Design a protein with these regions (language model features):
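Extended, solvent-exposed regions of the mature portions of secreted/cell-surface glycoproteins
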Residues: 21-140
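Positively charged n-region of N-terminal signal peptides that target proteins for export
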Residues: 1-5
Length: 140
């Protein structure tokens, strides 16, 4: 075996072992979130601009890289979350401004997600206790 091939194998083995060396236990703590706004039962209208706001408990971020938060929308009561409605957010963010889409539903639910690339797996925090309504667009 030539030196180049040996180096490639050693490099590949090192990369495959790296994620196991940094576990979520090393991250120190768990993630949770609670939606503040929109409130349970609140009626929103397509095109309306609102502030989505939450409180969260983050793990210790010391030594972690590539961390972000995202907020996803479900229009079927939280069974599926098919639409990311936020930009990639700093993990310490507590809100973002959102334009409500024209997706009428009586069962809108948000999922406030957190993760740190390979160091802390994407963690879901769906908010089914804070179901809200997206009304039909007014007819003009």
């Amino acid at each position: 075996m030539n030196t180049r091939g040996l180096l490639a194998i050693v490099f590949a083995v090192a990369l495959s072992a790296a994620p196991q060396l940094v576990t979520t236990a090393n991250a120190g703590g768990t993630y949770s979130a609670r939606l503040i706004s929109p409130r349970v039962g609140q009626v929103l209208y397509p095109g309306q601009h609102i502030r989505v706001e939450w409180k969260s408990v983050l793990p210790d971020l010391k030594g972690l890289a590539g961390c972000e938060m995202e907020v996803w929308l479900s229009v079927d009561g939280g069974r599926t979350f098919l639409m990311c409605i936020s930009p990639s957010l700093n993990p310490k963010a507590k809100f973002f401004d959102w334009t409500v889409p024209n997706m009428p539903t009586n069962a809108a639910v948000l999922d406030i997600r957190f993760g740190c690339e390979v160091f802390y797996p994407e963690t879901f925090a769906p908010q089914p206790a804070s179901t809200f309504v997206i009304a039909q667009a007014p007819v003009t």
